[in-house]
């Protein structure tokens, strides 16, 4: 099955990346509004119904701005490290799932493995 990866937005005004296989998808960061995320996905012919989870790379606003709204609206689990969750302003706790770098997470037919990166954040 083919894997589709695209940037819905990138830069200091917000980061959001879609990774999917036609059946299952995840978003990496939602640093743009829920409405803008939905709009950009629709423009690309991507269904929000395939999104099964959100992964948060770190707590900076340009990576988390729309996470809570989108996760609440679609009841999506949010995979986030404990350190990032503690630093992220206004991140929802009831949909949060803790994860760690180098420990794979299975989302449908996708296997997501995070890795540590140097950055000025709690746990990038």
Please name every model-derived segment:
Residues 19, 29, 58, 112, ...:
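Divalent metal-coordination and catalytic microenvironments
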């Amino acid at each position: 099955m083919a894997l589709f990866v695209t940037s819905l937005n990138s830069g200091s005004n917000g980061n959001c990346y879609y990774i999917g296989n036609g059946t299952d998808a995840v978003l990496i960061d939602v640093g743009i509004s829920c409405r803008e995320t939905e709009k950009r996905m629709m423009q690309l012919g991507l269904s929000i119904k395939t999104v099964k989870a959100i992964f948060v790379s770190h707590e900076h606003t340009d990576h988390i701005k729309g996470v809570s709204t989108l996760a609440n609206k679609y009841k999506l689990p949010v995979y986030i490290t404990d350190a990032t969750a503690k630093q992220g302003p206004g991140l929802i706790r009831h949909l949060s799932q803790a994860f760690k770098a180098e420990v794979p997470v299975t989302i449908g037919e996708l296997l997501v493995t995070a890795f540590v990166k140097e950055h000025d954040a709690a746990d990038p």
